[in-house]
Amino acid sequence: MKIYVVATIAWILLQFSAWTTTDAVTSITLDLVNPTAGQYSSFVDKIRNNVKDPNLKYGGTDIAVIGPPSKEKFLRINFQSSRGTVSLGLKRDNLYVVAYLAMDNTNVNRAYYFRSEITSAESTALFPEATTANQKALEYTEDYQSIEKNAQITQGDQSRKELGLGIDLLSTSMEAVNKKARVVKDEARFLLIAIQMTAEAARFRYIQNLVIKNFPNKFNSENKVIQFEVNWKKISTAIYGDAKNGVFNKDYDFGFGKVRQVKDLQMGLLMYLGKPKSSNEANSTVRHYGPLKPTLLIT
């Protein structure tokens, strides 16, 4: 009888463990107090490795591919400083940024979210520190153009490219929303920088490597960075449907010159587009999709 009871309890604990693992939100943290280039690189690799399917490979390459949708919908990213923590919420199946959490100037945790990407109930599960009363749907939309407009950097030809990237800039922009009264301009600038330093860096090793090369200093993004960001789906689709053994069947131009070798793109993570194509399918005409929405439903 004792053996039976112990076995029953063990089974119940195992089931409970499985439930909590399924329902829990995975968190990945970057400590911004004297970070090193190696720590940042490891942080980006953790994001990439956490959402990839190790059994998926496209186009005969070793590039990581996001896994298919699962019960665990979101990934939590924490930025820690000596003054506290600011967090982002990412969708696991595409790394779109859906929400962020920060303390206000009265030390109350408040969550802000894009209503088309996440519900209030999901926001509560992602950021339990913020009660429903302390949640707010953002007034602007989740595309780069809308965020840039609210960041007030769109005069003339200016865009997020002029805002720049870099670990020091990420720290500065984080502190502008950490334990402060909400200022939309500061919030939008933080989102632009954080999006590119997390989701975009995980997708594109090219961006990750630029941050490491300039570490920890701020640097202006180049046009190639922007072209990568708006062409993630197009690049993923081309590799998925028109590459064999890491070579495209024709030259592709994604906005920064012709490319034939997939490795020259320095990709980090591909969009999930289904099971890998067979060799015959890969040599056929590549399928065409609608406009890409890279990080935040971006066109």
From Swiss-Prot:
According to the entry, what is the taxonomic lineage of the organism? Eukaryota, Viridiplantae, Streptophyta, Embryophyta, Tracheophyta
Q: Which reaction does it catalyse?
A: Endohydrolysis of the N-glycosidic bond at one specific adenosine on the 28S rRNA
Q: What is this protein called?
A: Ribosome-inactivating protein saporin-6
Tissue expression, as annotated, is: Seeds and leaves of the plant.
The biological processes this protein is annotated with in GO are: defense response; negative regulation of translation
Task: List GO molecular-function terms, semicolon-separated.
Answer: rRNA N-glycosylase activity; toxin activity
**Domain of life according to the entry:** Eukaryota
Function description: Ribosome-inactivating protein of type 1, inhibits protein synthesis in animal cells. Useful as immunotoxin for pharmacological applications.
- Sugar-bearing residue positions: N283
